Design a protein with these regions (language model features):
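Aromatic (phenylalanine/tyrosine) cluster motif
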Residues: 6, 10, 24, 36-37, ...
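An acidic, glycine-rich, mixed-charge low-complexity segment common to nucleic-acid enzymes
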Residues: 42-84, 88-90, 97-101
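Nudix hydrolase/Nudix homology domain
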Residues: 44-45, 51, 62-63, 69-73, ...
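Conserved Nudix-box catalytic region and its N-terminal flanking loop in Nudix hydrolases
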Residues: 68-78, 128-165, 170
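Acidic, metal-coordinating catalytic segment for phosphate/diphosphate chemistry
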Residues: 81-124
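Unchanged
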Residues: 150-237
Length: 255
């Protein structure tokens, strides 16, 4: 799959809220039963949230969800609000590496989960140069992909490019499609934060000098070939590993 297929305008919320399925639904004949089946099936498939807490994962899904999950995951039912609090504590303290909390209304569960955190939106890129190398940054001893907070009033897609430019000193970025969205939590000054990060496909020239943004704790910026890329993956965050496993990203990187 060529990188050019990923370059062009893309609407973040279309993927986040599941609107990409509209193309599929539109192909079905106009009989009410067929349309109802398509919409119902798509809703069932989409009803799932995956949140990374430290090195563990909490999955929120409906009882109807048909998405596959790790067989080693612990499964619990969401009956009342205290179930969410207990699930968060269990995952956060490392008692369970993967916990699935399932209930009748996944959106209600999601709102309950979010009530325990301050939500911050961020954006970044999976950046590939003309040599098919991937851009990585080293921050606090861990390899990461360049990203940063979306400023007030700023468009997510613009923030993604700006953050990559600032953190790595690269120029001439071509922003493409949204590759995925990740959720992870952390603490800042005793406040629990939930970060929602939008990841875009990006390309740029390899003929430029990289410079880490030291004030942001970044000590190294590299273009990684396949061997170096795999080395970075072995020392990165679980949310990044999960992002790179997504089919759309795998096709984009061609590794």
């Amino acid at each position: 799959m060529r990188l050019s297929q990923y370059i062009g305008e893309f609407h973040p919320e279309a993927q986040v809220k599941g609107l990409l399925g509209c193309n599929f639904i539109a192909l079905i004949c106009n009989r009410n039963s067929a349309i109802f089946f398509a919409v119902s099936l798509f809703k069932i498939i989409q009803q799932m949230y995956r949140i990374f807490i430290n090195d563990s994962v909490l999955i929120l899904r409906s009882f109807e969800s048909i998405l596959e999950v790790d067989e080693q995951s612990e499964i619990q039912s969401y009956i009342y609000a205290s179930c969410m609090k207990k699930a968060i504590s269990k995952v956060q303290n490392g008692i369970c590496k993967s916990l699935i909390l399932q209930g009748d209304d996944v959106e209600h569960m999601w709102r309950d989960f979010c009530s325990h955190y301050q939500l911050i939106e961020a954006a970044g890129g999976v950046v590939v140069n003309s040599k098919s190398e991937v851009l990585w940054i080293l921050r606090n001893g861990k390899w990461d992909l360049p990203k940063g907070k979306v400023e007030f009033g700023e468009k997510v897609k613009d923030a993604a490019v700006r953050e990559v430019e600032e953190e790595c000193a690269v120029i001439g970025i071509n922003r493409g499609a949204l590759l995925g969205v990740t959720y992870h939590t952390y603490s800042c000054k005793s406040e629990a934060i939930l970060k929602k990060t939008y990841w875009y496909a990006m390309t740029c020239s390899s003929e430029q000098v990289l410079k880490p943004q030291l004030e942001e704790g970044i000590t190294e910026v590299v273009w990684a070939d396949k061997t170096k890329h795999l080395s970075c993956v072995s020392n990165t965050y679980t949310s990044i590993v999960e992002l790179l496993k997504q089919e759309k990203v795998v096709h984009y990187l061609c590794f």
